[in-house]
Amino acid sequence: MKLLVKTLAGLEGVLADELQQLGAQNIEPLKRAVSCEGDLALLYRANLWLRCGIRILVPVFDFQVESEEELYQQLRTIDWSKYLQLHQTFAIDANSQSSRFRHNRFLAQKTKDAIVDWFREQHGRRPSVNPKSPDIRFHLHIDSRHQASFLLDSSGDGLHRRGYRTTGGAAPLNEVLAAGMIRLAGWKGDQPFVDMLCGSGTLLIEAAMITGNIPPGLLRSFAFQNWQNFDADLWHGIKSEARQSKRPPQQPIIGVDNHFKAIRIAENNIAAAKLQSYIRVKRSTFQQFLPPEGPGTLISNPPYDLRLETRDINGLYKEIGDRLKKEFTGYQAWLLSGNLEALKNVGLRPSRRIHLLNGQIACKFHKYELYSGSKKKGKEGVDEKARNRPRLGRGSRPA
C-alpha cells in the first residue's frame, strides 16, 4: 500500500525519520509531504504515532484528464460502493496545478456530482455531503501535466488535532509545528526542557509526549475507522501496545508565562492530556525565571508583533537575549520568530538557521549555543548574583 503523508514546509526530513522508525518502506521526501509504502498496520500506527504529519492519504487511482466533462465521465465509471456506503457522509477536497482547471471549488462540485449520480443510477438513492465532519473524505489533485490523482483520507481531522487542546489562547502554535521544532532541536528527554514564553503550553505538551513515548493520537478517532476494510482487532491491538509503551518522566519540563490566562489555559491543556506528572508551569516573567542548571534545551516562540501587540518588540528580543546569556549557561536555546528584524536584537550569533512556516508567516528557527564562556563569572566561575538563588527543577511546585 502506498501512502502520502502531508506535513509542513521544513519538516519533511524529521517526518521521514519518524516513518522509518515505524517500519515504512521506500520513503521519499517531497515538498510538504513524504511518500512511503506499508501495510494496513503501518497505516494505523502512522496515524496514531506520527508527530510531524498533518494527514495520511492513500492513493486509489489516477488518470489523465483534459476537461471538466472528461473528469466527470471518468469518475462515473468508478465503483464508488468500494469506498463509500449510502448511509455515510462524504466530502471532497480538490486542488489543481493545471492551467485547464483553475477553480478548486468547481472541481470539488463536479466530483461530488459524479459520485452522487453514480449512486442514484445504481441504488436510486445518494449519500449526503458533510464538508465539515464527513465519514469519508476524498482528495482530488490535478498536477501541471493534467494528471488527476484520487486519494482517500485516512486521518479525518488533521493530525495536529491531538484531542488535548481545550482552548488555544491568542495565537496558539500548531501542534505539528511544535513537535517538529523539538525534533529539529534534537531533544530526546535526557536534559531539562524549558519554554520561557509558554503560552497555552503546546511545546511543553509535545515535549512531554516525546519523552513519555506517548502517541499523539491516543485521545482521538480516525477516518479509517469508517472504512469498509477496517480491522478492529488489528487497531485495538496496536492501541493496546501503544498504551503499554509509556515511560515515566526523566527530566523536568518547565513552562513560564507572565499572563495569568495563558497559565490557566496551559494547565487545562496539560490536564486534558493527562501530563501533570511530566510538566511544571509557573506564572513569572522570563526576566525573573531561573532554569535548572545546564546542560538543557530551551525552545520558545516569542511574539512577532504581527498578531500580538507588544510595546517594544525590539526591546523584548534584546531582553530575551540578555536573559539567555545571563542564566542559561550550558543550554541550547532555540527561538522561532516571524519578525526577522526583531530577531537580530537577541544579540547572539545563531549556530543554525532553519526556515519554517507558522501558518502563513515565514519564520526562522534559530539555534544559539550558550557556552559557559559567554557568561560573566565570579572567582569560582559562578554568576555571583545567581549563586544563592533557587532554581526551578523537577521537585519544584508550580505557582
How should these model regions be labeled?
Residues 139, 363-367:
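Conserved hydrophobic/aromatic beta-strand scaffold that supports enzyme active sites
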Residues 173-291, 306, 314-316:
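Conserved S-adenosyl-L-methionine
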Residues 92, 298-299:
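Hydrophobic beta-strand segment of the Class I
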Residues 150-184:
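SAM-dependent Rossmann-like transferase core, predominantly class I methyltransferases
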